[in-house]
Amino acid sequence: MSDRAKELEEAAASIDAASLDTARKGIVTGCQELIYWLELLSRRLEKVPPEKQHKFARAFSLIMLGHLPTRPGTCPFCVQYGQSRSCRGCGYATTHGRCDSDQSSFSLFIEAFSELGRAIYQDTGGLNCHPDDARLRLEHCIRSSRLLAADMMEDIDSLCTRELMERKARYLEQMIDLLPKELFGPEIMESWRRVHEMLRNYW
């Protein structure tokens, strides 16, 4: 085991069962809500005319981003060490920097993540591909993201803290990969790459 792996193992070992369970429930709630919206979007997609597909793609992307596990309630470290304890004793703060520090791993990720959402929201141009291709891409993105969210819910109960953080990082990466970035302008692709880069140090 590398020194870094040992540090992460030690950080995760400090989390108690109650905090881990609270974070699990927070993640599951987000997955359940996302699946609800994805099923709704799936039913509506077939009725979306070509001139509305770009707007639909933006809505899908923002709904997905808004339901990913990035909030404090989905992090066992934030649950245990946040609020009243002000991050004192937090193993994630020790290994990745305090989340309220501008240069911490989480701050750099959430800044890039928020910028991606802003770029998608402000992308009001037209489709960058043929409407038929856009529809197929959206069908794939919705179907695949729904499966990933369901898998995440199924996996999460049996995971320890270290495994949960690893699984969450992988889930974030997989879901962000399913954004229909090909349908948007070049700024979205650049923002997407930045999020990917910041995810390398998420855990």
What are these regions (language model features)?
Residues S2-W203:
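Cysteine-centered metal-binding/redox modules
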